């Protein structure tokens, strides 16, 4: 069982790292680059990004990480006091209560609004202005929470030790 929890924690740490990196890219340069375009070109570009992200390669990592974190949170509670259980619970919950719901409840609805507009319309320009004002802030939050979740999961792994070496 220790080996299974270790591997699941490693996969969750890798998942949160990949997601934090993806979110970090948006926070540090992608949204700035899109903001430098005209509203029409920015909308077209972001609509293309939104369409591309709805593919299995991203969705498996995003939802797979959430499932792993839910399982790991339960495992940490069931085996409370075991090496790494505190970090494991904290990291799993931080992703489940931070990056995951922020994405689903804030960023995705904003994406949906943006994909529904015609890029060269007044409504499109209005939605783009609101999108830029709020999407980035929510993205910063999910970036930080995914990164901190990753760090906590790595600390859990360090505290668990390598069960394959025993």
Regions found by a protein language model. Name each.
Residues 155-166:
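Juxtamembrane boundary at the C-terminal end of a transmembrane helix
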Residues 2-16, 77-97:
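Interfacial segments of alpha-helical transmembrane regions
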Residues 133-147:
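Hydrophobic alpha-helical transmembrane segments
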Residues 61-73, 143-150:
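Core segments of transmembrane alpha-helices
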Residues 7, 18-63, 113-133, 164:
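Interfacial loop at the N-terminal end of multi-pass membrane proteins
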Residues 28, 46-50, 67-79, 102, ...:
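Membrane-helix exit/interface motif
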